Regions:
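Surface-exposed helix-capping loop/turn segments at secondary-structure junctions
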Residues: 1-3, 118-124, 265
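A translation/RNA-centric and nucleic-acid-associated enzymatic feature enriched
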Residues: 68-70, 141-296
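Short connector loops at helix/strand junctions that flank enzyme active sites
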Residues: 35, 61, 84, 164, ...
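N-terminal pre-domains immediately preceding structured catalytic cores
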Residues: 9-16, 130-139, 281
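Class II aminoacyl-tRNA synthetase-like tRNA-binding/catalytic domains
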Residues: 1-80, 88-92
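A general structural signal for short secondary-structure junctions and capping/turn motifs
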Residues: 18, 29-31, 53-59, 79-81, ...
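Extended, charged alpha-beta segments that form solvent-exposed binding/catalytic grooves
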Residues: 65-151, 155
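Alpha-helix initiation and N-capping motif
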Residues: 45-49, 63, 86, 100, ...
């Protein structure tokens, strides 16, 4: 079921995505409400789970929405913008389905849709060929570290994506054997043992390109554990996190599919600004113009 997405939320609800815990949300006061502060969303990861409960969805049912977010502290480049647009989705599952088999089943469905869309684009435009492999390869972040211990996480992603064409890197957020994390994840939405990213090899830029991030969401046990690890126990006082601990919210799986990312991929563009209107440093705009690239 498609639903309307909020552009801003109240910070005291705990519904905004804190990302890695250091990115500052954009906030402003509402004049009519005595300048009560609200925050522009950074993602809808938590809000979607809350909405499923509030709207009365049942096990096996879900929602999707058209999300727009602003990430003011994003380090921009060819594939990163301060403006984030995603197809966001969330589905209620039974607690017994909080397992890797459920995650992989959903990943395969999302990948099948991505692959079929590429085939359609290739049939319509001569310059676009199908480059996605028939099947996606599953690999854990620890397996990547074991295989490439001397490389950075991003370098490992590139190696694996180039080898397999399309990969789903599982278990992102927790510490690996080296003590380092593969990548940061907020401790209060994804279960770090049951999440991951769909990443494809993108020959236009010779990079590993993340198209989607998803995961089975925390239950009361994994939330407590991850908040302890992240030294964020104060969040247990917020309504959203408290509702999880009190088992008032449904168990869910959810994720986001980057709209501009997949447009960039399907159209074989060199910069995300070619299919998304945002603001870029002047030197980036000038360099793009020198290379015949129009940033919207």
């Amino acid at each position: 079921t498609r639903v309307s997405a909020p552009l801003f939320v109240r910070p005291e609800t705990g519904l905004n995505d804190n990302l890695n815990g250091v990115e500052r949300p954009v906030s402003f006061g509402i004049k009519e409400q005595n300048d009560k502060e609200v925050e522009i969303v950074q993602s809808l990861a938590k809000w979607k789970r809350y909405a499923l409960k509030r709207y009365g969805f049942a096990v096996g049912e879900g929602l999707y929405t058209d999300m727009s977010a602003i990430r003011r502290d994003e380090e921009t480049d060819n594939i990163h913008s301060i403006y984030v647009d995603q197809w966001d989705w969330e589905k209620i599952i039974d607690k017994s389905d909080r397992n890797e088999a459920t995650l992989k089943e959903v990943v395969r469905k999302v990948y099948e849709a991505l692959k079929n869309t590429e085939k359609y684009m290739a049939s319509r435009y001569d310059y676009i060929g199908s480059i996605l492999p028939e099947d996606i390869t599953f690999i854990s972040s620890q397996e990547l570290e074991d295989r490439y211990p001397d490389l950075t996480p991003k370098e490992r992603e590139y190696k694996a994506a180039k080898e397999y064409g399309a990969i789903f890197i599982m278990q992102i957020g927790g510490a690996l054997k080296s003590g380092q994390r593969h990548d940061g994840r907020a401790p209060d939405y994804d279960d770090w043992s049951l999440n991951g990213d769909i990443i494809v090899y993108y020959p236009v830029l010779d990079i590993a390109l993340e198209l989607s991030s998803m995961g089975i969401r925390v239950d009361e046990d994994s939330l407590l554990s991850q908040l302890q690890i992240s030294n964020c126990m104060d969040r247990l006082q917020l309504p959203f996190q408290k509702a999880i601990m009190d088992k008032e919210l449904p168990y869910t799986i959810g994720g986001g599919i980057g709209q501009s990312r997949i447009c960039m991929f399907y159209l074989r563009k060199a910069h995300i600004g070619e299919d998304q209107s945002s603001i870029w440093p002047p030197e980036v705009v000038q360099e793009a113009e020198r290379n015949g690239i129009l940033l919207l």
